[in-house]
Amino acid sequence: MNVMRNASKVWPFMDGIKVVSFDVEGTLVTPDFSYAIWFEAIPRRYAQRNGIGFEQATKLVEEEYQKVGDQRLEWYDIRYWFDKLDLGIADPVMERCRSRVRYYPEVRDVLSSLSGRYQLAVASGSSREFLRHLLRDIEPYFTSVFSSISDYKRLKTPEFYRKMCQALGVQPEQVVHVGDNWQFDFVAPSEIGIRAFHLDRQRQSEEPNSLASLTHLEVHLPD
């Protein structure tokens, strides 16, 4: 499939859609919780355990992040980082940051509207440790939650989406997916035939398959 060609026009033949799947961070949930974990709580704990200042700890921790990079599974695995940095147990730290979970304003209305017409699923690159907190107030809207990291030990590749469709018992053409990462949420699912939309909240793209808000998704779905 020529993904870039398909990106130049809105997906045709949207009839027969059974499942709408959503990315989580940057799509349903703001970055606040993740920022609090990766750039506040972890450096603070590292500083305390090593007897150094917060700024120095932040610099050292971020250097370790960059050595791994976001194309490796470890990047997304909080238990890996707590072990590597000798920070103890992650769960209490995450629990203390739960108040930082924020949903985008339109999320509940969109999920409420779509849940009566489609099966809703989560297709996330976040670990289940994160999803437990991120989805705490909206999980009842979803019939299935998939974590590429925790469930399949992979990034959000075409194979991940293929396995998701198999688990849901649907063909890729019966699924719409929306998320904010061009590669993981648009290119990868599009390669197997999923009707994917790129969520661009900053409105940096003029592609028809890009949405500025989740409210715009319903325009493309059959009545």
Region spans (language model):
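Asp-based, Mg2+/Mn2+-dependent phosphohydrolase catalytic module
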Residues: 2-20, 112, 118-223
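N-terminal helical cap/lid subdomain that shapes the substrate entry/recognition surface
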Residues: 11-109, 129
